[in-house]
Amino acid sequence: MNESQKAAIHSEGPTLLIAGPGTGKTYTIIQRVLYLIREKRVKPEEIMLVTYTQKASKELTTRLTDVLSKAGIEVNLHEMYIGTFHHICRKILKEFQEYTHLPKNYLAVDQFEQQYLVYEHLSEFAAIPDFRRVIQDSYLKQGELIRISPWRQCQTICRYVNGLSEELLLPEEMRRTCGNQLGGRIEVLARMMMKYTRLEEERHFIDFSRLQKETYALLSSYPEILDQLQKRIRYIMIDEYQDTNFIQEQLIRLLGGCSQQIFVVGDDDQSIYRFRGASIGNILGFSKTYQTCHTFKLDTNYRSHPGIVRFCMDWMRGLKSWRGADGRMFRYVKGDIHAASEETGTPVLRITGKDLSECHARIAAFIEGLKERGQITDYNQVAVLCSSVKSNASRALQLQLRRKGIASYAPRAGWFFKRQEVEWLIGTLLLLFPSFSDSMENRDDMQETRGILDIYFECMGVARMMLAKPRHRALKNWLDRTRSVISYEKKLPASFLHLVYQMLSFAPFSDILDSAVRGESNAARNLSAITRLIARFGFFLPENHGHGEETIADVQLFFSRYLRLWFENGVNEYEDEERYAPSGSVSFLNIHQAKGLEYPVVIVPSLDERARWDAESDLISQVVEKVSGRKPAEPPKEMKNFDLWRKYYTAFSRAETLLVLASSQKKGDTSEAFQWIMPALPAYNAKEADYHHLTCRPVGRNVFKPRFAFTSQIALYEECPMKYLWHRVYRFAGTQGSHAMYGELVHETIEDIHRAVLRGEADRVMPSVIYGWMMANYISLSDKENSWLPEAKLKQAFSEIRGYVDFRKGNWDDALAAECPLELVKDDYILNGTIDLLSGNGDQVQVIDFKTGKKPPMDSLLMEKYRSQLEVYAYLVETKLGRSVERLVLYFTSDAEDPCVVFPMSKERVEKRMEEFDETARRILARDFARRCEMKKNELPTACRFCDFRKYCGR
């Protein structure tokens, strides 16, 4: 630990830590948490730790739990606010749900789904007066009229809506104060925001921007809630502060309160997410916002060769001035960054060629030479960082490497629809529905997306060749038979997703699944992605036919709209966060994708990139200034240059041992930004290039501690290891039915009752109020799941809920906690569980779990499973809460006469159960998935009856 790290760790009050690449910022963050807990006696749940990505959150959680465990400190991670801003906002909104305007069962949507919602209603947006002043449908390029697809227009709408929301601008205020300014565009933008908000609320959707906006509204509107959180959260730490936006800064200021124990870590030189709304002003202006701020700089690089460190410093210093006309600096002055290593040589090289083809051939020869000389032992020690891995140049380089026998790993290169297994599956589905595929050329919507018809026809052609092989005759027979049934009955014989799982039971798809059982399979990952897409499609059907009851028209909509737009949006393949650089392959990454990673050898070939004006960011900045008076943190005319310099600084600083800049010598193939630095670098094949003695470390893997819960993981594995493999590891979508929705409805309404009681509002627990809670839950569940329950089932649900209230007879005094989450850090995993109800008096408590199914016999395997679940909960309660568990209770809502099954607490059984839990967790971590649920006396096990892979297993 160096002196700068020590000073930062012990700092009090607002603190800014400038931490460049490889300077040990994660280590510093973890050591600060350890210091606060061990030396300052701060409780873990009094610390908020915010990360920029989920991957960073997993890494911090794993390293933090290891450090705390070694120090003998137990942490309940559920109580600690650790994760991304979106995760923490969800946690706050869930805790104070009744104070928000959100439905309980809102559907969190991603970027594609948000954009799809807008696409469904694009005509309504286009009807806004002067809409085309903001959203163009075409532009002129060298005298040619270029059409902008409707999908790209929706992308722009979403960017404006998200960006303005994250600037905390209210559309009503925008219209009232500045509507006619900027040529009336502020009025158009305000109407777009209002239209989008209405659509989102009608569908019970919530996107990432709204999560933050709702959290801000909650904290601003309820001082008592803000006060409660400020007292609970004593220390706030934010990683990657240069990537935060305005609303995130405001959330931190609210939660920080008067104590201002806010510790931020970042590097302004790596601020590369302006297009996502990141504000460099947050980190540049931190010391002005918090005038008692302490500023520290980490100046020792533990990652890179000294020559690479010097090159990166020269890059940032050698560019145009970072100082504005008024003398303001738009970059922190870093001073010299020192490398911890004392290696010699010339680690920064250039590769050029008379054209791209020659340049690519030399890059391939260079990589091959590194391997032959033993400087690298695996091709995964090399990464190629591009402005876009989907560019023609990037794909050409991948093909050049392939000719040399060098594999590439490029999950974001846009190859998804070219993968053989994807072509087989989509092609077979298209052949199954000739009512669409025979006429798709004549559909207007299919003309919107360039290349989609070619993709569909190619998929069908590849599928036909596959089906013609004798080995695949069973699939061909199934296809012919099912297609005839659909044609004759004019409806699907099963849900769309069920049909896919029937297909997967036949070769060649079953061969892919067999391979996935033996080891990691990217082909199985791609098939899984399609099942998840189909499952999510059900949330967007225009009519609610009931879960799994799609019509032929719905399937046509899937192909003509949902899958088409998925293609146009750009589909990424699976990325393993732990094995981020698969053995045997050179990694191809976008520069933004590479942020936070490091590679022994980095090659940067996209030196033709020029600084580009970002029209959307510019308009958002103008609107913010007009409406709120807040000026941009940087000169608008310089933003595009600053962004380009920071982007390539981020790329260059990923390198540990060797950094290579590559470019064609053709005019225009090296932009002005790089022309000054390329001649100063030695060519890779020049005599002065002294790098052959440099050897590279092996690329490791990230190891994240997984979370294991009894019901969703351990019990599922014990029921059938292979089912665990498909649904938990490969994430194939499940075909859940209305029975799951019924259980959710009863559970959520009982939770509403418990929450009211715990708030001291037991007097509200009366039939009319309970019915209102139940119907509110039902409406939001129905909208979310695109399903419904018959009237008789709703009456039954209300009867069971009332039965529980009657059973209580108004006695709620023993209720201690509802939906109580607990976690325990083990050596190799994190054990977690959520207890429906914890009740009792004094130190003696009972653990209660609610079941909506039929009560099984006492000697059945299912009852034993239920008891095991309670024993795991008992272990968590006694270990984490220090409370003695007296009884374990199952409450069956369907049994009005005798709903409770009570088990005595047995420490011997709990210890045995936890030994079994550990053993099951060990098997999961060892990827022992080859076993199926056992058949007994030719009787189909219960686990198989509703299993999506039943036919694959031949059962």
Q: What is each of the regions a protein language model found here?
A:
Residues M1-L102, A108, D227, Y649, ...:
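P-loop NTPase Walker
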Residues G183-L189, K195, F205, Q375, ...:
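Accessory C-terminal helicase-associated subdomains
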Residues S583, V627-P682, R923-R945:
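C-terminal accessory regions
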Residues M1-I18, M48-L49, A56-S57, Y81, ...:
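Conserved helicase NTPase motor core
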Residues Y81-K91, M237-E240, V265, L565-E616, ...:
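Conserved helicase core region in the C-terminal RecA-like lobe
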Residues L34-R38, F246-T352, V624:
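Conserved RecA-like helicase ATPase core segment
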Residues L17, T26, P44, T292-C293, ...:
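Helicase P-loop NTPase motor core
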Residues T289-Y290, T346, E372-R518:
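ATPase/helicase motor core of nucleic-acid motors
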